[in-house]
Amino acid sequence: MSSGGLLLLLGLLTLWAELTPVSSKDRPEICKLPKEPGPCRSYLLYFYYNSVEHKCQTFHYGGCEGNENRFHTIEECKSTCAA
C-alpha cells in the first residue's frame, strides 16, 4: 500500500474514533438504566441519560423511588454518563 493510501486509512480511522460514541460498556451501570419517574406525583424536572440516543434528556421525576439514573443538572448527567 502506498504512503498516500496509508495516510487516508489513518485519517479515516481517526475520524471514525472521534465520531463514535463512547461504548456503553465504559459507562457506569446507572447510565444504562431506563428513566424511572417513580410512583409519586411531585412532577420535578430532572435529567436522565438516554442510552439509546446517547445523550442526557429531561424527564419529570415524581419525587420518590425511581432509580439512580436521575440528575439535578444536565452537567451532572453529562459528567457521569456522556464522558
UniProtKB/Swiss-Prot annotation:
Keywords: Disulfide bond, Protease inhibitor, Secreted, Serine protease inhibitor, Signal. Expressed by the venom gland. Its main location: secreted. The keyword Secreted applies. Residues 31-81 form the BPTI/Kunitz inhibitor domain. The record marks R41, S42 as: Reactive bond for trypsin. Disulfide bonds join C31-C81, C40-C64, C56-C77. Residues 1-24 form the signal peptide. It is found in: Secreted. The keyword tRNA processing does not apply. Gene3D superfamilies: Pancreatic trypsin inhibitor Kunitz domain (4.10.410.10). Belongs to the venom Kunitz-type family. Serine protease inhibitor. This is Kunitz-type serine protease inhibitor vestiginin-7. The lineage of its organism: Eukaryota, Metazoa, Chordata, Craniata, Vertebrata.
